[in-house]
Amino acid sequence: MIPGEILTDDGEHELNAGRPTLTVVVANTGDRPVQVGSHYHFFEANDALSFDRAAARGFRLNIAAGTAVRFEPGQTRTVELVELAGERAVYGFQGKVMGPL
C-alpha cells in the first residue's frame, strides 16, 4: 500500500451521493486558459469566468478529488457543482467569504 492510497471494491462508485448539486453554464471571457481544481470554492473562481456567481456560493466542482476542469479562452461549457460539506465555512481563495456561508 502507498501512503494515502485508498483501496476500493471493484465496480462503479458514486461520488457525493445524496449531496445537493447545481448545474451552471460557464464562459471563459478571458484570453488565457483558466483551470479550476476539484475543491476550489467555485464562487471565487477566476473573474474571467462568467457564470451565476451568486448561485455558486458554497459550491465546488462535482469531480473527483485532485482533478480539475480547464476552460479555454472563448469556451463555454456546462459543469455540475456540488454543495460544500463539513462546517460550511470558507477561508482563503480570493478572500471573498472568509467565514461561514
Swiss-Prot record:
It is an enzyme of class 3 (hydrolase). One of its GO terms (molecular function) is urease activity. It is found in: Cytoplasm. Keywords: Cytoplasm, Hydrolase. It catalyses: urea + 2 H2O + H(+) = hydrogencarbonate + 2 NH4(+). SUPFAM superfamilies: Urease, beta-subunit. Pathway: Nitrogen metabolism; urea degradation; CO(2) and NH(3) from urea (urease route): step 1/1. Pfam families: Urease_beta (PF00699). Its EC number is 3.5.1.5. GO terms for cellular component: urease complex. GO terms for biological process: urea catabolic process. NCBIfam families: PRK13203.1, urease_beta. Heterotrimer of UreA (gamma), UreB (beta) and UreC (alpha) subunits. Three heterotrimers associate to form the active enzyme. Belongs to the urease beta subunit family. This is Urease subunit beta.
